[in-house]
Amino acid sequence: MSLLVTRTSMAERSQRLARLIADQLAKRQKPDGTFDQHSFYAPAFAAALWAQLDPALYAPQIEAALSALEAEQQTPRYHREFIEHGLRQIPGLCAERLNAILRNAPTQSPDVANWQVLGMINRHLSLKKGAGKNRKLINWLHWAFIRLRYWRTPLFWDRPTCFSSQYHAFCAALLTDSPEAAHRIIADKATTLMAKLSGDHGYANLLGRGAGQSFGEVCALYALTKHGFHTQADAILFRLETAALMTGTIPLNLISPADLPSDPGPANPKTPGWYSYNRHDDYLAFAGYWLLKIAATPTEPRPPPKPPNLKAASIAIFSTLAYQAQMSLCGTHSFDLTPCPVVLSGSGTTTTLLFAPTGGEEDAPSLYGPASIPLPATSDGKYFAQIRKASRTKNTVRINFKLAGVSGQRTITFEDTQITITDKIAAKCNLLRLLVHHDVKLVQTTKQQLHAPDLGITFKADRNLVIDETNHFTAAGSARRVVAPHTDHVTLRICWGTDDV
């Protein structure tokens, strides 16, 4: 199926992508109803997509998917919440068939916001079929728990004290359609934050676990569309269409779009930004389902809202005409925190990633580890700094870190056409260690100055700089490392335009 980017309505464009995905899933489905690569919930969301799009055309695929789900062994990793949600979106699926598939499988209910919200929404969907007052009370208590544990206006934690724009977007998308007014009020506040994160560049998902992945992008697209943020939604949809043109599908990682290898995973350089639980067919079916929902519910644009107040929040967003920078200031894992800001240079759909999200899978072999974090390290490469605390005062972020028992500090100041990064520590070591996206051409003009000619950006330091090209990865793929070697202090100014101060 050919795909052309045209100035048609978002509903039509979303429908076209959903149809593309539906056809691809039909081709990828095996005779037994499963998919080529192991998946957790692809059959359920694929069946929902097919049943809503064209139940007659895809009848054999729908039946095969349901039969596969009936035959599936319910292991401890059985994604009950996701499978149930997909099944409940299939028009006309009888309760007997639903129960035959789910059987007595327990819910996972991890201490993660999106799973908790999904479980609550599933319970709401079951209430429509005549559940009693006890379940309504349980849902009310569950919502109180979710708000207390995960909601910190205007954002949802992923896990307590950890932010992920991907799973924030999923929570907002789920609550947007809730029949409960209290849920929709929270969804509106959460979506306003997504509008700020997305801007006009179309990258809605750059902070925290799952950065860059299609899962968060389609959820953000749905919530933004439903709430009338059409400028932001249009830019996200453009990114999805562009990725589809480049790869012929919707890749799992939209900030590293490429053909799917036979062995995708977190350790494969061809699939950067993946986690051990990521599955191409899960995310493809999930994306198709949300895109079709967008096509089915067109909305009118709304006036720009009042920007969310982030003064006390754990994330920081700095937007100027030259760039947008995003930071997450708390968390427990490498992918939670941003010791170097995620920076987008320029505006609109021509925006370029300068500094991509860093960190990644930690519970399985992966491309990521302590060495891949953009913080100082000892000159021999044996020890790497760890963040102790991050805080923000107006346009300045301070990060306290410890390296081989020695305390140090990074200060990042954001101005209209300049970002200044200063590292200080009471020992000679390798400072900065910033990871510049591989698409950015970087030229060393003097020992203390670098130039990105295509972006009009100059890196000016008061110490010597080195460009290290060897085997570094961000969530967007390979990167060049900028290092101030063997020093105890460095100030780097990243300047847009012709500022020679």
Task: List where the protein language model places each region.
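Extended polysaccharide-engagement surfaces of secreted carbohydrate-active enzymes
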Residues: 2, 196-469
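Extreme N-terminal leader/anchor segments
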Residues: 2-15, 19, 23
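Aromatic-lined, polymer-binding surfaces characteristic
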Residues: 3, 23-186, 198-201, 208-222
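Short amphipathic alpha-helical segments that mediate assembly, nucleic-acid/protein binding
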Residues: 18, 59-62, 95-98, 233, ...
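Type-3 copper protein
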Residues: 188-191
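Beta-strand-rich recognition/accessory modules
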Residues: 449, 458-501
